[in-house]
């Protein structure tokens, strides 16, 4: 505002006086979020660790915990939390031990369905759209990724293993078509008309979903608040630069309009990445290549990069035995019609 500019100029003209002992704010890299977490010690007589930590904070504030809710209220909360459905009258009157009810709900298929909805919001699950048969965004048959999420949660698969599969199933499990469904996370970002828009979406939502950072803010310049440089952004892009999407045949079906496995694969390992000056894809700095890597602030957490040898059908899915058998059946059917 003009009046604020006047105040700043007046302050400068007066000598720009400031408190001599004014503390200098810590750099962004000193924020607790970028530090290795330490386990908080719990009292020896602690029951539930969450309750123990809450009680410690309540004590500092002079607060007291509310008494436990009655059992029917707790059962109702439990059902809504774990499976997203209210209990029946009979279930409200269940007298079994609390742990038995919890274990039963955790083992029910509705548990994975209920919690998959929340994670699919974070991971941006979306069916494909286009014009006619033209695919413009996401992928056909992306429901296979949705089913993998539900099944993984119901199988109590570790969150770390789920992330690894969504980002690198094509390299970690090239033989396992069930696990390959996980790469729908990356395939969902597909955008027909602009490769940079496609990769920008991949970078932004991978960082938001898995490291809680707005890496997209560093596309045009260094991040204003987080310790992320513009070069960090393009190093992260270089990780995804080689990848493409495709539909692989599934057993028993050769028509991709009816069914298929949407997935990613490395199409061009030599695809170069350049820093876009001011974020403009029409103005790449071709004086130097950007090597793949995570933001420098996270480098200590990054695993060592190792080459992976893939089977031939990872590049040529039509060479799988079941694909050739299905196509042979199609040909025989056509011959019979003739």
Predicted features along the sequence, with ranges:
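Sequence context surrounding c-type heme c attachment/ligation sites in exported
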Residues: 1-2, 171-269, 307-314
């Amino acid at each position: 505002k003009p009046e604020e500019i006047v105040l700043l100029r007046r302050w400068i003209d007066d000598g720009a006086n400031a408190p001599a002992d004014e503390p200098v704010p810590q750099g962004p890299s000193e924020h607790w979020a970028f530090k290795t977490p330490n386990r908080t010690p719990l009292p020896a007589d602690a029951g539930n660790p969450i309750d123990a930590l809450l009680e410690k904070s309540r004590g500092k504030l002079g607060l007291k915990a509310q008494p436990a809710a009655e059992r029917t209220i707790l059962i109702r909360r439990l059902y809504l939390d774990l499976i997203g459905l209210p209990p029946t009258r009979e279930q409200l009157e269940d007298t079994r031990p609390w742990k038995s009810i919890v274990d039963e709900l955790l083992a029910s298929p509705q548990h994975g369905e209920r919690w998959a909805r929340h994670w699919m919001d974070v991971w941006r699950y979306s069916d494909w759209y286009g014009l006619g048969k033209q695919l413009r965004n996401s992928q056909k048959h992306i429901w296979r990724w949705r089913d993998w999420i539900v099944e993984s949660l119901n199988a109590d698969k570790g969150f770390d293993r789920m992330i690894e599969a969504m980002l690198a199933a094509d390299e970690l499990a090239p033989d396992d078509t069930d696990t390959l469904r996980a790469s729908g996370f990356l395939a969902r970002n597909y955008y027909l008309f602009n490769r940079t828009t496609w990769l920008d979406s991949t970078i932004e939502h991978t960082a938001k979903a898995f490291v809680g950072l707005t890496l997209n803010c560093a596309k045009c310049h260094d991040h204003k608040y987080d310790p992320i440089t513009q070069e960090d952004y393009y190093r992260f892009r270089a990780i995804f630069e080689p990848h493409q999407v495709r539909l692989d045949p599934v057993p028993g079906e050769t028509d991709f309009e009816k069914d298929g496995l949407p997935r990613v694969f490395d199409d061009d390992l030599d695809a170069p990445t350049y820093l876009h000056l001011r974020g403009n894809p029409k103005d790449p700095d071709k004086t130097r290549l950007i090597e793949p890597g995570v933001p420098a602030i996270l480098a200590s957490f990054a695993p060592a990069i190792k080459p992976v040898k893939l089977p031939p059908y990872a590049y040529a899915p039509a060479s799988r035995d079941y694909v050739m058998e299905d196509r042979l059946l199609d040909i025989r059917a056509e011959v019979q019609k003739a």
